[in-house]
Amino acid sequence: NTHEIQALALTEACVDDAEAGKQLLNDTHGEIEQISGDGSYDKRKFYEATSRRGVKHITIPPRRNAKIWQHGNSKKQPLPRDQNLRRIRQIGRKQWKVESGYHQRSLVETAVFRFKVIFGNTLNTRTLPRQITEARIKVIALNRMTQLGMPDSYRVI
């Protein structure tokens, strides 16, 4: 809830979100209480990475045509994805998003929006290693601005 960016990943276009997400997990220090992401993270490799990292609560909506990975009669611990899928089947996707805290993900979208408003939508350097350095410097600056104080926001009726 600090509104700070904890990790960043710049990748080539051929890298999927779940693969980039694994890198973000590795680059994040300390305990991770909750991961929220859109359906593009609904892949085994990402769930396995969150399990290895010890993430307590995983809020990723399974794809609409998703199937259970590990059935309920298994002696193994239930998979978080399967628990999410079962709950969605019980109460519906919309209610699941409210119940699970899925909308916390909008804080990430807001941070990315702030980044783009302040620094623009493009990077100035040409090579990927330099772009990563440029993005890291900008993230440090944005986090410092965030630490100095977020604007007061309120609803206008």
What is the role of each PLM region?
Residues 18-19, 44, 67, 75, ...:
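Intrinsic disorder/low-complexity detector
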Residues 1, 5, 30, 87, ...:
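General secondary-structure edge motif
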Residues 36, 61-62, 127, 151:
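Short loop/turn and capping residues at structural boundaries
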Residues 29-30, 71, 81-83, 136-138, ...:
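Short, intrinsically disordered/low-complexity patches at protein termini
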Residues 41-113:
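Helix-centered, glycine/charged polyanion-binding patches within enzymatic domains
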Residues 90-157:
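Basic, amphipathic alpha-helical segments enriched in Lys/Arg and hydrophobic/aromatic residues
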Residues 1, 26, 65, 73, ...:
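Detector for Asparagine
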Residues 1-56, 62-63, 116, 137-139, ...:
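Polybasic low-complexity intrinsically disordered regions
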